[in-house]
Amino acid sequence: MADGGRVAQARALLQQCLHARLQVRPADGDAAAQWVEIRRGLVIYVCFFKGADTDLLPKMVNTLLNVKLSETETGKHVSILDLPGDVLIIPQATLGGRVKGRSMQYHSNSGKEEGSELYSQFVSLCEKAVANNTKSVEAGVAVAHGTYGNRQVLKLDTNGPYTHLIEF
């Protein structure tokens, strides 16, 4: 359940990192695998549920990019925009799973087309928010993202037990 007893429309898992690398396309014949990567920053895993709509996206982006979870060298907690740090966005439908017996079920997740559209717009809004942030622009902050609906390989170096689950 999200705040106030209402049913969640989305779930995001935030993971601080020193470096992350995500394979967005596997090797195929002569073509090498394609990867996106970020330096120190934030990995955002995101899942949308049935009933989610585009009205939710600005609130999600504002919350996720402005929550003070990143730690400076002096130990002060700041947002990823204030750090500034890179952002890697990964679609993660398994965040919507529920245990039934000894199996996982994903009946609450949005449909593939709806989820793909919400994910695409979420990525765009994150890119715009970073591009409109002076500190991020000056630091050359990167926003990278995975491909909705594909299995992806992730390599991640973390800098502490900084993993947070947020429902919207």
Swiss-Prot record:
Catalytic activity line of the entry: a D-aminoacyl-tRNA + H2O = a tRNA + a D-alpha-amino acid + H(+); glycyl-tRNA(Ala) + H2O = tRNA(Ala) + glycine + H(+); D-tyrosyl-tRNA(Tyr) + H2O = D-tyrosine + tRNA(Tyr); L-alanyl-tRNA(Thr) + H2O = tRNA(Thr) + L-alanine + H(+)
Molecular function GO labels: Ala-tRNA(Thr) deacylase activity; D-tyrosyl-tRNA(Tyr) deacylase activity; tRNA binding
UniProt KW keywords: Cytoplasm, Hydrolase, RNA-binding, tRNA-binding
Enzyme class: hydrolase
Localization terms from the record: Cytoplasm
Coiled-coil annotated residue ranges, if any: none
Motif (Gly-transPro motif, allows the protein to recognize chirality of D-amino acids): 160-161
InterPro entries named among the record's database cross-references: Daa-tRNA_deacyls_DTD, DTD-like_sf
Single GO BP term: aminoacyl-tRNA metabolism involved in translational fidelity
GO cellular component, one term: cytoplasm
This enzyme's EC code(s): 3.1.1.96
Primary role: Deacylates mischarged D-aminoacyl-tRNAs. Also deacylates mischarged glycyl-tRNA(Ala), protecting cells against glycine mischarging by AlaRS. Probably acts by rejecting L-amino acids from its binding site rather than specific recognition of D-amino acids. Catalyzes the hydrolysis of D-tyrosyl-tRNA(Tyr), has no activity on correctly charged L-tyrosyl-tRNA(Tyr). By recycling D-aminoacyl-tRNA to D-amino acids and free tRNA molecules, this enzyme counteracts the toxicity associated with the formation of D-aminoacyl-tRNA entities in vivo and helps enforce protein L-homochirality.
Subunit structure: Homodimer.
Domains as described in the record: A Gly-transPro motif from one monomer fits into the active site of the other monomer to allow specific chiral rejection of most L-amino acids except L-Ala. The trans conformation of the motif is maintained by Arg-151.
Family membership: Belongs to the DTD family.
Protein name: D-aminoacyl-tRNA deacylase 2
Provenance organism: Mus musculus
